[in-house]
Amino acid sequence: MTEQRKSLIKLISAVIIILLLPVLFFRFIGDDPTKKAVNSTRQIAVVNEDTGVLSDEVKSDEEDKSAQFGKEVAAVLGERPDYSWTVVNRSAAETGLASKKYDAIVYIPSDFSKNILSYDKDHPQKATLEFSIQDNLNAVNKEKVQRELEDAQKTMNKKMSALYWNFVSQKVDNIRGEFDKIVNKESEFQNVMYNFYKPSSNDLAGEIKQQKDLIDELKKSMNEAQGTTKEKASTAEEAKNTLKEFIDTVERYKEYQENQKKLLLAAQDSTQQQIRTGLDAIQAQQKANQFSERMSGLATGIGQAKTQIGLTNLALNNAEKLRQNQVPLQEMGMKKIENDMFNAFLSRYKSQYEAIKYQNLNQLQENIGKNRLSLLKPKESDEKEDGEDTSDNKDDTDKEDIEDIKLDLEKQRDELKNVATEIKDISEGLKEPEQEKPTTPDAEEPSTDDSPNTEEPSNDIPTSDDQPTNEDTGSSEEGTQDNGSQNDVQTNIETGQKHQESSKNVPEQDTNTENTGTSKTDFSLIELADENDGSNQSDGLQGDGADGETDISGAKKRLNEAAIKLEEIENALQEKQEEHNNKLEKHIDELNQEIKELNKTVSKLNDQIGDLTKKLVDFDNNVNDAYRLIYNLEDEIIQTLQSRGYIDQKEKLSSIFSSRIETDNISNLMKYYNSLNLYKSTLNDNLDLGSLTIIKGEVIQEQDGNVQSVLALTPEESASWEALKNNTMQTDEDINSFIDGMTKFADDYSGYIRDSQAGVLDELTKISESAAKASEQLVTGATQESATFSNDGLSGTMALSVQDTVGQEVLQMSDMMGSLSDRQSGIIDYTTNMQQSVNDVQAKADTLNNNWGKNVASTKLVRNDVYGILGNTLVDGQNNGYVYDYLANPLKISGEVPEEKIQTVPPVVILVIVLISSLLIGYFSSYYQNAPLLVKGALFGILNILVGLMISLFGLNIYSLPDDQTIKWSVFTILLLVASSAFIRTAFRFGSIPGWVASAAMILFYVAPLIDLIMPNFTFEDPVSKVYIDIQYGTGHLFTMGITVLLIITVIAVALPLIIRLMAEHTAESDETYEA
């Protein structure tokens, strides 16, 4: 594949990537990235478990006599527009809450209505509502649900207040009905009394008058009867005189006797008729007399009732006047109490607020001082102490391990010292030969062999660093000298001793090296002894004299003994060496395992160190920002204290703020910043609504006694009402006693009439019997006289005696009639008195009726006053809801509410894809900057136009706009892409470093709006976002300015490379000309 084809493939791949990038980006972010996920259903379940309560004041249906306020509350909640309130049972509500169907549940308990109607009890209970919010809601939706529940609580309180006032008006309505009943009963009583007295008195007067007329007629008849009796008596006298002449004229006497008989019979019939008439009149007169006697007691009772009613009327008038006079006094008292209450409330609240504010400032000032001290002394000692403890523990552990693996060679060291001393003695006892040693290969071999043997122990003896020491080197050099093998052995032994001493202070040893070194040291000593022995023998053979041989043999013997001791030492060392090697191997395994773990830990710590380094940089930046915020807040507090005149607090805080902050502890910084915020908020706080409500309640509670004293009944009014009550009770008692008297009077009058009638009937019976006897005697006399005359046996004496008897009977009857006439005269007088009493009773009944009418009028006035209380709550028998709403919420807050501003968010999605695409196009154009101008321009223009159109089309799916604004949006997006990519291309024209700096600047320019949206304390005025927002939400007047600026930037970015190229060519031509 040629380079040209590779370049073509690269070009096509880059173009495809640039064109596919917007498609992939918009597919990655989704169709509607600005849509907020809502996890709330905006439905609240209401569980109504209210059982209701019976109440006389509640106007309920005939079927349901109980008051159920849970239904009222559910109906009110159902009218709220923001959330859907559904009434369900408990199980359905809890199931819906678990399945996320409802955002919350409101429980109305079973005693809800009962607690609401307990307002007139000694200890009223508040009606409570319980609610449960769904746990899966986010913080925003939970806050919305809580706010909705709080608003619902206000609505329910308003409804409950209206219901309370409804109950009050219903009670007042019941009182009105009771007053209507009282007025009606009093009116009925007045009518009954009037109907009782007026018609009965009139009828009674008429009957008495009629009875009086009858009695007059009876008296007249009795007088006539008495006159007739007297005539009859005179006639009897004449008959007696006539009888004396009877003898003379029998015929005259017979005729006269017949006439007398007729006259007496007629008189007898007339007298009997008059007696019957008189009997009826006497009965009526007796009734009238008895009624007149009893009516005198009735008149007395009515007089007492009249007096009592007069007192009652007087008491009512006094009470009415006193109550009317109390009205202006009560109004003045209420106004005074309101003013006093308001003034007391303001003064107390101001004083309490200032005291609390000053106290809070002092407390917060102390907290600021304490927190500021914590910022001056960073807490590093604890960490150091922890580190030191850890290192100490580690050192202790290492020391313990070293003690465990330390090799105890003290005994062998002592034995080696003894052997070394003996060998030294042997070497001193030996005499050196006087002749020179021949230099042969055999003589040089021991030294050659000794050198490595000597060096090996020095290198292999265990040390702390596993390195050979200088003493080892010295010992090896000494082993190569020709001063004698005894010195070599002694030197090697001393070297071994020094290495053994150094091993006591070394924490780590190499097991294999130590074993090898120790064994080689021992064998080298034995070999040295043998070789020295051999060399001495050879020297002795070459030398002369027997003394040399004796010394050598003795030395050899002693060296053999030393060799035996060395073998024993070697065996002991071998045993300890094996034991020590086992411990070392075990310890080395443990150390290897620890090393592996430490390596892992180190790798993890390296990663953490990298992360912590990044975090440390961010932390330093955050700490610097925190310092700056704290210093600014301190300056604001000092300025506020200076402006408000808090000099003492200003001086104290200035001394506290004068020190510098020298800590990196975020917790202490946050505490200190929180203390400063609390101090600032407390200093700037003006009113506390919570304490305002509490103080208001306290002041109102204190003024309750004054209000009660103003509205309560005064002693005079209470006495008046008590007198009215007593008078009314006395009136009732008088009326009851009057009724009892009337009943007793009727019973007594009935008995009296019966007795009187019995007496009159007895007298009339006697009169009738006398009249019958007289009539019988007359008849008998007439019969006897007829018989006598007929029988001629009549004598004058008999007639005279008969006439005398008749005369006596007539006189007796005349006397009885006179007595009856006298009694009738008494009845007439009694009837006249009774008629006068009846007339007086009528007058008194009229007076009673008038007084009782005044009482009814006073009661009607009271009724009108009662109807005036909350009279507007009922209209045509229906509740006036407007009045109840007014009573529940008498205050109205009016004011202008500023319109909610539409939150304008820049199109961050467009900015991000424009940034990425412009960077890629700029990199691509700079990469092919050596291509022909037409090719570069075509590729640059086509890519910008295609990518810009794609970004605009996909962006319009997210940000919907009208047609004219759509064109502006697309044009501005394409020009923005062209200007950005041209800027990058031009920057890379000057070199890679300017190109990358320009890229970083452009990234910062496009990312700054995102930071502005996220960080509340960061502000960046982005001109590109302003143009987009103006096109999206405004009138588009910034479009022209934005297009102009982009065109200028594009022309400069495109023309600048051409100008630089022309200048470079011109400079090159000048140089060539100059060189030529």
Curated annotation (Swiss-Prot):
Region (Disordered): 372-404, 423-552
TM segment ranges: 9-29, 904-924, 938-958, 964-984, 995-1015, 1040-1060
Entry similarity comment: Belongs to the EsaA family.
Recorded phenotype for the gene knockout or disruption: Cells lacking this gene are blocked in YukE secretion.
Name under which the protein is recorded: ESX secretion system protein YueB
Record's GO cellular component terms: plasma membrane
Gene source species: Bacillus subtilis (strain 168)
Coiled coil (residue ranges): 552-622
Underlying gene: yueB
Cellular compartment(s): Cell membrane
Main location: membrane
Biased composition (Polar residues): 449-495, 503-522
Membrane topology, from the record: Multi-pass membrane protein
Known function: Required for YukE secretion. Probable component or regulator of the ESX/ESAT-6-like secretion system (BsEss). Bacteriophage SPP1 receptor. Essential for the irreversible adsorption of the bacteriophage.
Composition skew (Basic and acidic residues), residue ranges: 423-439
Keywords: Cell membrane, Coiled coil, Membrane, Transmembrane, Transmembrane helix
Superkingdom of origin: Bacteria
